[in-house]
């Protein structure tokens, strides 16, 4: 079997669909189960799974701590995930990709600006309709804060995220995942739409987080190992 390499982003371990496919009901159980699959892939299939260090590695460790997971999971992370810093000076990205990214970001920023303008106009219109009723100033202020400002801000946040965040690379760890995969000629494992989009632009193999455990299970079903062989491979 051709030796394969995969680069994980944080969602490769934290995506609910990935660990629910393993029959888990909590994030901590799910991360442990997926790391078990990573161990199987390493020992029996010659598959190596990497995480960019320190960016993604620290994000994953923070997830473990913030969700009060068993400290043993930290040990599994250090044991089975290969930590590597991408060579940001050696990896070359075609100028066409850079041009397309800037153009794409400009269009998303314009969408975000349109969402902002819509929210402002809606707020003004609703405030005018309330003031037209002739209520007392204090009562009007409370009603505006309660009925107008709060609801518009919630709606604005949802639309702004959709316009500006989904499908883009919005953090250094996202970029590190792509650079490391490019450096290693590895596949990317993620549930992030931005990483997926730009992995495809860079010609990188991409696998959704939920598909990785299924892939390992499928491989393992065709690798019948006797007890002696298992022990030998674990030495």
From Swiss-Prot:
InterPro entries: RNA_free_RNase_P (IPR014856)
The UniProt record lists the keyword Nuclease: yes
Pfam families hit by this protein: PIN_5 (PF08745)
UniProt GO MF annotations: ribonuclease P activity
Uppermost EC category: hydrolase
PANTHER family: RNA-FREE RIBONUCLEASE P, UPF0278 PROTEIN TK1425
Name of the protein this chain belongs to: RNA-free ribonuclease P
Organism: Methanothrix thermoacetophila (strain DSM 6194 / JCM 14653 / NBRC 101360 / PT)
């Amino acid at each position: 079997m051709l030796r394969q390499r995969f680069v994980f982003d944080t969602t490769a371990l934290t995506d609910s669909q990935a660990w629910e496919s393993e029959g888990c009901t909590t994030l901590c159980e799910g991360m442990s189960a997926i790391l078990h699959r990573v161990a199987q892939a390493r020992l029996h299939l010659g598959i190596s799974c990497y995480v960019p260090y320190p960016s993604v590695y620290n994000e994953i460790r923070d997830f473990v701590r913030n969700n009060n997971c068993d400290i043993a999971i930290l040990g599994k992370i250090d044991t089975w995930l290969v930590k590597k810093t991408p060579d940001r000076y050696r990896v070359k990205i075609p100028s066409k990709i850079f041009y397309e990214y800037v153009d794409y970001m400009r269009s998303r920023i314009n969408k975000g600006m349109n969402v902002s303008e819509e929210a402002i106009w809606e707020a003004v219109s609703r405030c005018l309709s309330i003031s037209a009723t002739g209520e007392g100033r204090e009562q009007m202020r409370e009603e505006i804060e309660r009925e107008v400002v709060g609801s518009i801000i919630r709606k604005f946040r949802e639309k702004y995220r959709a316009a500006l965040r989904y499908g883009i690379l919005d953090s250094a760890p996202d970029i590190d995942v792509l650079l490391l995969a490019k450096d290693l000629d590895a596949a990317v494992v993620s549930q992030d739409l931005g990483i997926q989009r730009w992995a495809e632009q860079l010609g990188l193999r991409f696998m959704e987080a939920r598909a990785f455990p299924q892939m390992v299970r499928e491989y393992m079903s065709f690798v019948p190992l006797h007890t002696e062989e298992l022990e030998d491979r674990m030495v």
